[in-house]
From Swiss-Prot:
InterPro entries: L-lactate/malate_DH, Lactate/malate_DH_C, Lactate/malate_DH_N, Lactate_DH/Glyco_Ohase_4_C, Malate_DH_AS, Malate_DH_type1, Malate_DH_type1_bac, NAD(P)-bd_dom_sf. One of its GO terms (biological process) is tricarboxylic acid cycle. This is Malate dehydrogenase. NCBIfam families: MDH_euk_gproteo. It comes from Vibrio atlanticus (strain LGP32) (Vibrio splendidus (strain Mel32)). Its EC number is 1.1.1.37. The gene is mdh.
Length: 311
């Protein structure tokens, strides 16, 4: 099993690479790529960690050597948020990066499962889809927007509020991956009751958690470490499913039936071909239904921007 981390010299990429070096199954190959010349050194550094995962780093303009033979590609390349920026501000730089990487993937590893971390995910995933379609290699089961950070934040914040073990909390998060498009289904958390005020406050905090970190870092970065953990959780789930483990379920932003939007985050059953089944997100509370209805214009607009960009 070969996993490629693209954007591996950045804050998310280095955290993700460290976690994968420690947690990938024995015998896995980990390839790191970044345009930055430090990348082979990041791989050398990580290679000293005594785990049965081989690691190699590649730098320069061409990601092809890292992508060759990859089963899973995790893309965190791009610029990070700074104070005053929202995810849409990132679009101008990151859209072009994702487009060119998708073009390389289409040629080099067209059957790989691709997980996109690069923001704005609502828009970068449709860009990648359009590029892969143009190349004639698109398989919607193999393209994911990684929204796991919204899930782990939800689990953490609920556990803190209710004094529970975060490992016991499961919160499905649907919609998209920015602002109002992030919808945690707090009505479905088992063994926990919330007041209306708690639901409103928690939902807002989860939606704005990225900004919370950007501001706390005072211009020194964005949510890199927690995102690395979230991407590792999703990447490992994908690896397990590809290797035949049953009942692997994670929320992800995928192309579905298009009931609400062409791409939508919801629980996905992962399997040997990627997304084996897109699962129902179940019954919504009135609060959640209203939040869903009011986000759809934003989400569909984000998707349309990506489709137009890739034309």
């Amino acid at each position: 099993m070969k996993v490629a981390v693209i954007g591996a010299a950045g804050g998310i990429g280095q955290a993700l690479a460290l976690l994968l070096k420690n947690r990938l199954p024995a015998g896995s190959d980990l390839a790191l790529y970044d345009i930055a010349p430090v990348t082979p050194g990041v791989a050398a550094d990580l290679s000293h960690i005594p785990t049965p995962v081989s690691i190699k780093g590649y730098a320069g303009e061409d990601p092809t050597p890292a992508l060759e033979g990859a089963d899973v590609v995790l893309i965190s390349a791009g610029v990070a948020r700074k104070p005053g920026m929202d995810r849409a501000d990132l679009f101008n730089v990151n859209a072009g990066i994702v487009k060119s990487l998708a073009e390389k993937i289409a040629v080099t590893c067209p059957t790989a499962c691709v997980g996109i971390i690069t923001n704005p995910v609502n828009t970068t995933v449709p860009i990648a889809a359009e590029v892969l379609k143009k190349a004639g290699v698109y398989d919607k089961r193999r393209l994911f927007g990684i929204t796991t950070l919204d899930v782990i934040r939800s689990e953490t914040f609920v556990a803190e509020l209710k004094d529970k073990d975060p490992g016991d909390i499961r919160v499905p998060v649907i919609g998209g991956h920015s602002g109002v498009t992030i919808l945690p289904l707090l009505s479905q958390v088992e063994g926990v009751e919330f007041t209306d005020e708690e639901i409103a406050a928690l939902t807002t905090r989860i939606q704005n958690a990225g900004t919370e970190v950007v501001e706390a870092k005072a211009g020194g970065g964005s949510a890199t470490l927690s995102m690395g953990q979230a991407a590792c959780r999703f990447g490992l789930a994908l690896v397990k499913a590809l290797q035949g483990e049953e009942n692997v379920i994670e929320c992800a932003y995928v192309e579905g039936e298009g009931e609400h939007a062409p791409f939508f985050a919801q629980p996905v059953k992962l399997g040997k071909e990627g997304a084996e089944a897109i699962l129902s997100y179940g019954e919504l509370s009135d609060f959640e239904r209203n939040a869903l209805d009011s986000m759809l214009e934003t989400l569909n607009g984000d998707i349309e921007i990506g489709v137009e960009f890739a034309k």
